[in-house]
């Protein structure tokens, strides 16, 4: 055998998506990317993601809690949807789980204050952010206010062209030498100074007893539009997020740039794949979880018992006894994907990447056999038999993928929800597209990876 043939036969070489797909698939790729950009531009909170999913599911004939083709929503921040397969549920399920929360700024319980005739909203950051990312850029307000009379008032300000936007002011470089420039990057912007500028005109009238007239003007405006008072902030979920639409990035339009791609890119692709799979062999279950970015705490997260309730209901409605034995027997036959993004190699920061093992943008869905950090702490590690089965099916269906880790061993790491689901006994692996600028207000994904993630999920749900 010639050396060239030997090399081709025995060595591994990653494949670029655009070098492997034909014009028909490139057209489909662009269509999916356009749909994704529209989704990403309007869906910026967990509640908005659930609302989007519910609308799409009902349009496709899914009914709440229907046994054969149904969905379940909990607290408006968790969504599950399923369709029964040809094989009985005792043969196991095909599960894809992603998370729909994203790093952001939450308003504090008592957020509104006035200082030097300017009105601000105080925030508390949610999830892992670099605080300097959030200053000096246009911001929008998304969320809901729960009134004592039971009404839920939805608020979105800063997304329409006619809307005002908000911002967090930065300090000019002329005055920033001691307070910012001489400090570590992580200390230059402190959390308590992530105050959002919201108003600067005093309320009309000259009553000297009223001291905070700009704050009162803000309250007057928000009361006229939404009927809420200052006390209503206590029972509100109001988030500060980047304003504006997702965009194509690059002169060749090869990337999608926008907020919240970790992990709504996996939510979007898994839901789209799920809706397109007809008559699956195994029961398909898609889960959209909350609170992953803060350790999966709370009753809408992967640590909650809500997943067990869904499985027990499926068991019961299948005519089986809803016993722990049946539950765990089904789990041991279940195959799952923890659909989450990973860090793509950024050539500007090669000192933290392992070039041989980390994911490259444009080379397909990234499969992380294990997560965690250091000595694989806090990690799930997929069994190789399951990984080989999955990759064989992807090969047969021409899915372009790469198997990767995330960064050099001692540089850090990350976790996903897979370890919580692995505890039930199912086979599960992490897979999703690599991103640049992850956890920033403007994350970057490659269209080729977006498309291959959708294709990989669709293949998995079929087999």
Residue ranges of each PLM-predicted region?
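N-terminal hydrophobic/helix-forming segments and targeting peptides
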Residues: 1-463
């Amino acid at each position: 055998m010639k050396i060239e043939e030997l090399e081709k036969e025995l060595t591994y070489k990653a494949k670029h998506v655009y070098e492997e797909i034909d014009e028909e698939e490139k057209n489909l790729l662009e269509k999916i990317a356009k749909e994704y950009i529209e989704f990403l531009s309007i869906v910026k909170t967990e509640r908005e993601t659930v609302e989007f999913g519910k609308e799409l599911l009902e349009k496709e004939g899914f009914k709440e809690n229907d046994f054969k083709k149904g969905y379940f929503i909990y607290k408006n921040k968790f969504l599950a949807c399923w369709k029964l397969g040809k094989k009985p549920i005792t043969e196991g399920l095909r599960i894809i789980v992603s998370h729909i929360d994203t790093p952001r700024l939450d308003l504090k319980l008592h957020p509104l204050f006035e200082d030097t005739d300017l009105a601000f909203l105080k925030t508390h950051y949610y999830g892992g952010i670099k605080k300097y990312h959030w200053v000096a850029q246009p911001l929008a307000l998304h969320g809901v206010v729960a009134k004592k009379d039971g009404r839920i008032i939805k608020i979105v300000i800063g997304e329409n062209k006619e809307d005002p936007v908000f911002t967090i002011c930065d300090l000019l470089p002329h005055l920033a030498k001691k307070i910012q420039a001489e400090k570590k990057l992580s200390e230059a912007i402190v959390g308590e100074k992530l105050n959002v500028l919201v108003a600067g005109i005093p309320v009309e009238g000259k009553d000297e007893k009223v001291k905070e007239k700009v704050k009162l003007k803000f309250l007057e405006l928000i009361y006229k539009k939404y009927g809420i008072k200052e006390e209503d902030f206590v029972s509100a979920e109001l988030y500060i997020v980047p304003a504006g639409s997702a965009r194509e990035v690059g002169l060749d339009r090869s990337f999608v740039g926008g907020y919240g791609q970790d992990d709504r890119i996996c939510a979007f692709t898994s839901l789209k794949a799920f809706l397109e799979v007809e008559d699956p062999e195994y029961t398909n279950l898609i889960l959209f979880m909350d609170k992953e970015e803060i350790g999966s705490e709370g009753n809408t997260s992967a640590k909650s018992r809500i997943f067990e309730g869904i499985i027990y209901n499926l068991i019961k409605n299948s005519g089986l006894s809803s016993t722990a034995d049946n539950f765990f027997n089904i789990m041991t036959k279940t195959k799952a994907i923890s659909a989450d993004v990973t860090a793509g190699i950024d050539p500007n920061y090669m000192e933290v990447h392992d070039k041989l093992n980390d994911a490259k943008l444009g080379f397909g869905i990234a499969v992380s056999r294990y997560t965690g950090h250091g000595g694989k702490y806090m990690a799930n590690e997929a069994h190789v038999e399951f990984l080989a089965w999955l990759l064989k099916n992807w090969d047969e269906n021409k899915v372009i993928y790469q198997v990767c880790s995330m960064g050099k061993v001692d540089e850090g790491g990350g976790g996903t929800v897979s370890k919580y689901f692995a505890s039930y006994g199912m086979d599960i692996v992490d897979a999703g597209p690599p991103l640049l600028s992850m956890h920033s207000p403007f994350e970057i994904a490659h269209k080729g990876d977006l498309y291959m993630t959708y294709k990989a999920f669709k293949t998995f749900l079929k087999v």
